[in-house]
Amino acid sequence: MSSNKASFFTRLRRLCRLTVWLFKTGKNLRGIDGGCPESRNRAVIELGRGVLAALDIGLEVGRPAPEHPNGVLVAANHVSWLDIFAMSAVYPSSFIAKQEIKSWPVLGKMGQNAGTVFINRNSRRDIEPINRAVCETLQRGQNVSFFPEARTSSGLGLLPFKAALFQSAIDAGAKVLAVALRYYDETGKRTARPSYADVGLPTCLWRIVSMKKLTIKVDFVCVADAAESEDRYALKDKIEESIRAVVADDADIAV
């Protein structure tokens, strides 16, 4: 067995704990359905931490979230399905996610109850109603997170950001928070193994549970005022450049 892999027993233990977590969560999904924002935020934080704990995944916050009011559009780079749980564990919000996730067992229902907006990434007709829905959510004081790359990458760099959904922040007069996500192995080097870019969910999950140690680092990079941007393209460029600088910082030591 390769020295950088978890034992078979450890892999099975992690999968069993995740299964138990899914079962328990599936019975208590109403905890994030309705209610006051504070109670739902607490439930979302617990969900995020629960998944990471079940899989023995460490979580570090490099640059902490700045003080700001609610109703923030959060933009992050996209590496893995774990991104949502890592972000939820430290900064609860609703998400904009691909339509396929809605049909996933338990996770799809969790997303619906947490206010996730599901989109068809191949349909431009979805953009206007989604921007309107996100704008209304932001104006109600609820945070919304999304991944402007629109698909997962290796995590060692960025794919070009899409500008369309930044319009919702401009329409709502909201702040935009840039978040950089990086994944590290047991040696402290960057790793692309948790990436969901070129494999299905079962293979991705097996890669994750097979790692001796996995740590996700979350950096809250900067806050931009959408009202001060010339248009959604200028806003997109500012957020993309700030995230790219952090993601590229130590990518040269990746394994």
UniProtKB/Swiss-Prot annotation:
A motif (HXXXXD motif) lies at residues 78-83. GO terms for cellular component: plasma membrane. One of its GO terms (biological process) is phosphatidic acid biosynthetic process. Pathway: Phospholipid metabolism; CDP-diacylglycerol biosynthesis; CDP-diacylglycerol from sn-glycerol 3-phosphate: step 2/3. It is found in: Cell inner membrane. Pfam families: Acyltransferase (PF01553). Converts lysophosphatidic acid (LPA) into phosphatidic acid by incorporating acyl moiety at the 2 position. Belongs to the 1-acyl-sn-glycerol-3-phosphate acyltransferase family. PANTHER family: 1-ACYL-SN-GLYCEROL-3-PHOSPHATE ACYLTRANSFERASE (PTHR10434:SF59). This is 1-acyl-sn-glycerol-3-phosphate acyltransferase. It comes from Neisseria meningitidis serogroup A / serotype 4A (strain DSM 15465 / Z2491).
